[in-house]
Structures are given as structure tokens and as C-alpha cells.
């Protein structure tokens, strides 16, 4: 669990080779923003949405993060290098910044609760 830290920002997304598509989800203590685009089709995002985050949502996200576990992960795949897809998660605040990149759809046991929340939010914004 992360202690309540208003400077914490969680970013996640996916990117696929051949301009097939990419998205990003940016979560802070006040806002959730989602952008999805298919670079091969247009420079204009197909989806660009944002909404305020509730205190309950923010607390659930903070409770889903074991920061020590996350900081110890060293995933750095490059499926996009061979026209595949990669997923990424970055966590940053005033004191730390760490990012992992892994094969799209892979569940990592030590961060699965966070991955589940990110997946739910992504589904909400894509519909």
C-alpha cells in the first residue's frame, strides 16, 4: 500500500508495432485521463477522455500498490521491436520514478490488483 501522496502519478498503456495502435491512462489524485490512437490512421486520437477521480477510487488504487514489489520489478520487453505489443506501467512521485514494460496481457502476480484496476478503467473509457 502506498501512503496517500498527492504527487503520485500512475501511467499505463500499450503500444503495438506497425502503427496498429497505442493508448495511455494517466491517473493522479484528482483526475483520470485516457487517450487511444491508431497512428497509422490519423494523428488525431480516436478517444480522448478525462474525468475526476473519486476519493474512493484513489484510495482503492493506492491500496492496490505494493510500492516495494513494484520497484523491484525489472520487466523491459520489446515486443514492439518485432511488431508485437507491449504493455507498460509507470509510477512516479516526488521521490521515485519506475517503469516496467511487458508482453501485452501478461499478469504479474505481485501487481495483479493494480493491473486489474487499470484494466477496468481502460474498459470504462473505451466504451
What are these regions (language model features)?
Residues 26-32, 94:
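Short, solvent-exposed coil/turn segments at beta-strand boundaries
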Residues 1-17, 51, 59-62, 68-127:
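Short, well-ordered, aromatic-rich surface patches in folded extracellular/luminal domains
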Residues 34-48, 98-100:
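Acidic/histidine-rich, surface-exposed loop or edge segments in extracytoplasmic proteins
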Residues 18-28:
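Short, solvent-exposed loop/hinge segments that bridge or flank secondary-structure elements
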Residues 16-19, 41:
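Short glycine/serine/proline-enriched coil/turn segments at secondary-structure junctions
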Residues 32-33, 70:
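Primarily extracytoplasmic ectodomains and periplasmic/lumenal surface modules that are beta-strand-rich
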Residues 21-23, 47-49, 85:
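Residues that flank catalytic or metal-binding motifs in active/ligand-binding sites
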Amino acid at each position: 500500500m502506498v501512503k496517500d501522496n498527492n504527487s503520485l502519478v500512475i501511467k499505463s498503456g500499450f503500444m503495438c508495432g506497425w502503427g496498429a495502435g497505442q493508448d495511455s491512462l494517466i491517473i493522479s489524485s484528482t483526475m483520470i485521463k485516457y487517450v487511444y490512437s491508431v497512428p497509422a490512421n490519423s494523428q488525431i486520437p480516436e478517444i480522448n477522455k478525462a474525468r475526476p477521480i473519486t476519493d474512493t477510487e484513489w484510495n482503492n488504487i493506492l491500496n492496490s500498490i505494493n510500492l516495494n514489489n513494484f520497484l523491484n520489478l525489472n520487466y523491459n520487453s520489446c515486443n514492439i521491436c518485432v511488431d508485437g505489443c507491449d504493455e507498460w506501467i509507470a509510477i512516479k512521485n516526488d521521490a521515485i520514478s519506475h517503469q516496467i514494460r511487458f508482453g501485452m496481457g501478461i499478469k504479474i502476480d505481485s501487481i495483479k490488483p493494480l493491473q486489474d484496476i487499470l484494466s477496468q478503467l481502460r474498459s470504462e473509457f473505451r466504451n
